[in-house]
Regions:
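Short aromatic-glycine motifs in intrinsically disordered, low-complexity regions
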Residues: 2-14
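Catalytic strand-loop segment that frames the active site of acyl-thioester-processing enzymes
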Residues: 15-54
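Compact, glycine-rich, soluble single-domain proteins
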Residues: 47-70, 88
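HotDog/MaoC-like acyl-thioester-processing domains
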Residues: 72, 100-150
Length: 150
């Protein structure tokens, strides 16, 4: 099991954008299971007119960070200004099964479908208390040198 310190050594995300709290299982090059505890104190809930549902974009970003953790597990890059940076190049077959609300702990399951050169295809789902809340049929990520993106 890996906590925040270990996660920070692998990917460049930091508060308030780091949306993974713990890695509970990992099979490098194959699959990962991560946890994200949703709190009512997160910046997305600062507006009093916001409802209880955790924003879908943040839920998907949390899943995507889990995907980056899997692909970077054996080749960490905690500095987004150097080395290669992961970019989302496509997401398909997304199905939302229900809301996530403060107090929920989201369990992201990500599996590597294929990896070639500077690209990876992943798929998976997210659970809350054993209930599926999100499915991602295909998530494609590309890696580019940070210097090329400046």
């Amino acid at each position: 099991m890996t906590g925040l310190a270990g996660i920070r050594r692998i990917i460049p995300h930091r508060f308030p954008v780091l949306l993974v709290d713990r890695v509970s299982e990992v099979d490098p090059g194959s699959s990962i299971v991560t946890l994200k505890a949703v709190s009512g104190r997160e910046p997305c809930y600062a507006d009093p007119d916001v409802g209880d549902a955790y924003p879908l974009g943040l839920l998907m970003e949390s899943w995507a960070q889990s995907a980056v953790l899997l692909t970077r597990w054996d080749d960490p890059n905690p500095d987004v200004r150097s080395g290669k940076v992961e970019l989302i190049s496509g997401i398909r077959d997304v199905v939302v099964h229900g809301d996530v609300v403060p107090g929920d702990v989201v369990e992201h399951h990500v599996r590597l479908v294929r990896e070639v050169a500077d690209a990876a295809i992943l798929a998976g789902h997210s659970l809350v208390a054993g209930r599926k809340v999100l499915e991602i049929g295909s998530f494609t990520m590309a890696r580019r040198r940070a210097e090329e993106l400046a």
